[in-house]
Each structure stands twice: as C-alpha cells, then as structure tokens.
Amino acid sequence: MLFKSLQSISSVSSVQKNQISSISVGSTQSNNNAALLDAAALVVIPGLLTAAAVAHI
C-alpha cells in the first residue's frame, strides 16, 4: 500500500516536471521566475493533496 502511493507520487512529480519545463520554455517575460513559481505552486499543491488523499485510502 505504501509502495503503491509512493509510486503514484513519483509519477505525479515527473508529470509536474514536464509541465513546469514547458511553461518555462513558453514564457519569455522578464518576470518568468515569478510566473514559474506561481505555475509550480498551482501544479504541485493539488498534486500533493491528491497524493495525500490516495495515501490515506
């Protein structure tokens, strides 16, 4: 059970890395660091909540 939840967390994090890298490539603004942090927060926080919910089941 624990291993399964760890597997799902690692697969989610790899998807997040792909999304974040595509956002950073597409962003040419001077404040792209701030935009990248916002995007990372939007992607990572729901992912962590989902992983926590999966781990509790």
Swiss-Prot record:
- Main localisation: membrane
The record's subcellular locations are: Membrane
Give the record's keywords alphabetically: Membrane, Transmembrane, Transmembrane helix
**Record's Gene Ontology CC terms?**
membrane
Question: Which ranges does the record mark as transmembrane?
Answer: 34-54
The UniProt entry lists membrane topology as: Single-pass membrane protein
**What's the protein name?**
Uncharacterized transmembrane protein DDB_G0286193
